[in-house]
Amino acid sequence: MPARHLYFIMTNTWNRLALLIFAVLSLLVAGELRAGVVVGGTRFIFPADRESISILLTNTSQESWLINSKINRPTRWAGGEASTVPAPLLAAPPLILLKPGTTGTLRLLRTESDILPVDRETLFELSIASVPSGKVENQSVKVAMRSVFKLFWRPEGLPGDPLEAYQQLRWTRNSQGVQLTNPTPYYINLIQV
């Protein structure tokens, strides 16, 4: 076995071992883990016939959280249409203070929809950052979290049923592996291939 392959295997093994040790030690010193803000969904659909949609935010902790929200063009997922034009949707209010044990509502508003395609869905990113308040107490850590959710703009009158769109996916084997083609106007999320 060449030395560089052995080095890679050992490095990979040592990295896994170091990660396992770090995880175990983190659990031993963690003491107490508290949840923060829960967002009412994992992906959101904005129908074109609506002026706005609402998203529920729930503070499950004993401290206040500052929530910062914004909508961007997609950068994290394949299939997103690259564009330099700002998203024609707005998160309001952009800053929300959630007191302990309360809920708040984030509204997504359309600013102009005539620049979006009418023959297919458009993908956006809804970015929600949660920042804890208060002082850090002895031997504890506070972590700000940024979650990014898929937000789909769905024009009116698209053909077919979005819940059945996955049945129209076309799988083709080629020299590089398998190619998947989606002939529908809907984005389809695959859980497992």
Descriptions of predicted regions:
Residues 5-21:
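Bacterial N-terminal signal peptides that target proteins for export
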Residues 35-60, 160-173, 177:
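Beta-sheet-dominated interaction scaffolds and their linkers
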Residues 61-83, 185-193:
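Short acidic, flexible loop segments centered on an aromatic residue
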